């Protein structure tokens, strides 16, 4: 158990260092040596966990997506009414991501430029797992007649598609810097969507 915790701590140190370097120099200029120095580790230790800087970028994204799923699951099982949960979930899937990339928002385009082809495949799985969580809540709402008799899986997919326009890689660095404005627009969209499927 102690060894597992130590491994997680080292991995987090490496990923924290990666995100600081992404803010400072972007993915193209960043080297594994830079990451090791920033994390206060040997290059060998970094390579033990990650084989390349592309792997580091994906691990950083995976860490954010994991936080998103945890937040969605927490909201999904809360005691709030279905409509409130759906709105909070729609907001959370974006705001958790926005907050996570703030430090390196100016270099986010360069990150996706390097990893985009592989990322596009990977994000299908991210979205599929998020949609499953939304579908559970929608199914509950349909069953309790608080929501219209919509198809839960299809509606969950539509809700994700509607909010994808607010994902960090869909926004400019300037928009990413105006999170309050983005959140306001996102909230308005979520209100419209949830109202549209509510009885």
Each language-model region and where it sits:
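Hydrophobic/aromatic residues within well-ordered alpha-helical segments
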Residues: 53, 60, 64, 68, ...
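Basic, helix-initiating cap at the start of DNA-binding domains
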Residues: 1-25, 29-38, 55-59, 63, ...
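C-terminal peripheral helix-coil segments that are non-catalytic and often amphipathic
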Residues: 1, 88, 128, 132-144, ...
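Short secondary-structure transition hinges
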Residues: 94-133, 143
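Short amphipathic alpha-helical elements of helix-turn-helix/winged-helix folds
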Residues: 17-21, 92, 96, 162
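Hydrophobic alpha-helical connector segments
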Residues: 59, 73-102, 155-159, 186
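Short hydrophobic/aromatic patch on the recognition helix
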Residues: 40-50
